[in-house]
């Protein structure tokens, strides 16, 4: 999870750095939490909590953050998932918002098996639509990084174990 967290933090930091480049100080961005919302046979849905500390007297409106996540395996790009959020208002001071991300479990397992590792090189491509009051600007996102997906698997196994009732535990033990 920390790698995914760092990756999303990096993507958002690039966005805000460009958006606030004319201001006195660059806002500080921090991922303050993440939670696996839902895991099913097909997808894992994660919510990333982002805190922006904007020391500037003015805020900014992000109309939309939208990005796709690809695994980079043997020269190929394999689609893993998508993240998107709209209407984010960054005010002066502290602002917190959530970035929902959906990842394909089938593709994630496929890539991990091909790589023979839980550490997967990925690329995030997308756009950030920023409303600068006078005009709107689309800022491209193109980030390459390695993530460790073992945390997703570990958290889901623990969740499943915690949800077992005594009868299920007894039948497993036999």
Curated annotation (Swiss-Prot):
SMART domains: WHy. The keyword Transmembrane applies. InterPro entries: LEA_2, WHy-dom. SUPFAM superfamilies: LEA14-like (SSF117070). Its main location: membrane. Keywords: Membrane, Transmembrane, Transmembrane helix. Pfam families: LEA_2 (PF03168). The chain crosses the membrane at residues 7-24. PROSITE patterns: PROKAR_LIPOPROTEIN. It is found in: Membrane. This is Uncharacterized protein MJ1138.
């Amino acid at each position: 999870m920390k790698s995914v967290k760092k990756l999303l933090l990096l993507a958002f930091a690039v966005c805000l750095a460009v958006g606030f480049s004319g201001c006195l100080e660059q806002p500080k961005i921090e991922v303050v939490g993440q939670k696996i919302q839902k895991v099913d046979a097909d997808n894992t849905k994660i919510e990333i909590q982002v805190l922006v500390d904007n020391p500037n007297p003015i805020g900014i409106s992000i109309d939309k953050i939208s990005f796709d996540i690809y695994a980079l395996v043997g020269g190929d790009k394999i689609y893993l998932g998508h993240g998107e959020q709209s209407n984010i208002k960054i005010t002066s001071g502290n602002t917190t918002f959530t970035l929902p991300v959906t990842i394909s479990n089938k593709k994630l397992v496929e890539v991990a098996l091909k790589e023979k590792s839980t550490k997967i090189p990925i690329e995030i491509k997308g756009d950030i639509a920023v409303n600068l009051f006078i005009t709107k600007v689309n800022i491209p996102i193109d980030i390459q990084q390695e993530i460790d997906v073992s945390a997703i698997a570990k958290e889901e196994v623990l969740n499943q174990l915690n949800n077992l009732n005594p009868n299920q535990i007894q039948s497993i033990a036999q």
